[in-house]
């Protein structure tokens, strides 16, 4: 949608998936309203919450500093992928930015990101981020991983260095890739970035400014570990065929990714003191690695579904 409006607004829709976020969604929306370069709209989808999330979001409308705030509800909890697809289907701008309802942007996030996108052919840009605050704050340096790989796509496949709430991407590229896979209950964002960037030569950027703060909820980082592992292995197998068009060993990248996923699970189970699941993960590791290898070498790749139609409305996959 073209506009002749003041330069303090950018042609961006912010996609906010929210679930049981009544206590945090105001902070998220306030960080959008505080941008030095404002998006034209924020589209919130309340994914079946029972705590008044949608009402808490709607209450922020008078404080959005001219940004259109549109809030939608679903009757049941369908997951973040489905909620984001609904928000994308409702969006009206050529650029999409993503922010979850418990996290926040720093004030210059959108201005700095759009400076790396406008006038270029890049399909998306992302950046570093913070976790924690004060003395416990940690700067996560995503740009180093981006710069550290001869092929950024292979590096992304191996190390998953794009944080979803830092991304601004072209709406048409998101739609062409098919949107978020709602069947993946974890890592839908990682799957979509790989789908958008898998064609060799697709330009994207990760820059080194920490313009996002992730708020780690108690237990959140340690929840759904087994589900994250299963989804991660499925995604690794899904994009194995795309590695064959790249320099280097596709099998080595597959093994690297599957191993990294298991090491992450082991760290979580170790921190929890869950010895049973830790030992089970160690025992299953070689079998999962072998199964992924055999599947990738012997079976034809399953096509990725289309979860947004070509006109950007929500599809069924």
Put a short name on every predicted segment.
Residues 1-31:
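N-proximal low-complexity "stem/linker" segments adjacent to membrane-targeting elements
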Residues 4, 191, 198, 204, ...:
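C-terminal subregions of glycosyltransferases and related glycan-biosynthesis enzymes
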Residues 31, 46-55, 76, 100:
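A conserved acidic beta->alpha catalytic loop
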Residues 74-91, 112:
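Glycine-rich, basic loop-to-helix element that forms the pyrophosphate-binding segment
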Residues 96:
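Short aromatic/hydrophobic "clamp" motif used to bind/position activated sugar donors
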Residues 146-235:
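Conserved nucleotide-sugar donor-binding catalytic segment
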């Amino acid at each position: 949608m073209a506009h002749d409006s003041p330069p303090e607004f950018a042609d961006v829709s912010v996609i906010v998936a929210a679930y049981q976020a009544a206590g945090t969604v105001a902070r998220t929306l306030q960080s959008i309203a505080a941008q030095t370069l404002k998006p034209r709209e924020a589209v919130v989808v309340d994914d079946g919450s029972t705590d008044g999330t949608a009402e808490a979001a709607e209450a922020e409308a008078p404080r959005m500093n001219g940004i259109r705030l549109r809030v939608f509800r679903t009757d049941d909890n369908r997951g973040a992928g489905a909620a984001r697809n609904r928000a994308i289907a409702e969006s009206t701008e050529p650029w999409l930015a993503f922010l979850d309802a418990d996290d926040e942007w720093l004030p210059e996030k959108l201005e700095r990101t759009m400076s790396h996108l406008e006038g270029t052919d890049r399909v998306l840009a992302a950046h570093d981020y913070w976790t924690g605050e004060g003395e416990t704050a940690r700067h996560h340096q995503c740009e180093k991983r981006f710069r550290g790989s001869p092929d950024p796509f292979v590096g992304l496949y191996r190390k998953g260095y794009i944080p979803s709430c830092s991304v601004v991407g072209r709406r048409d590229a998101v739609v062409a890739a098919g949107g978020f896979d709602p069947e993946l209950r974890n890592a839908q964002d990682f799957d979509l970035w790989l789908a958008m960037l898998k064609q060799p030569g697709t330009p994207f950027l990760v820059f080194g400014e920490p313009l996002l703060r992730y708020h780690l909820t108690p237990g959140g980082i340690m929840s759904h570990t087994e589900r994250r592992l299963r989804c991660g292995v499925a995604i690794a197998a899904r994009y194995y065929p795309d590695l064959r068009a790249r320099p280097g060993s596709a099998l080595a990248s597959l093994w690297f990714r599957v191993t990294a996923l298991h090491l992450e699970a082991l760290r979580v189970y170790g921190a929890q003191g869950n010895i049973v699941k830790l030992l089970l993960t160690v025992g299953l590791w070689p079998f999962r690695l072998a199964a992924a290898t055999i599947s990738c070498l012997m079976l034809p790749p399953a096509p990725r579904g289309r979860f947004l139609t070509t006109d950007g409305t929500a599809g069924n996959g």
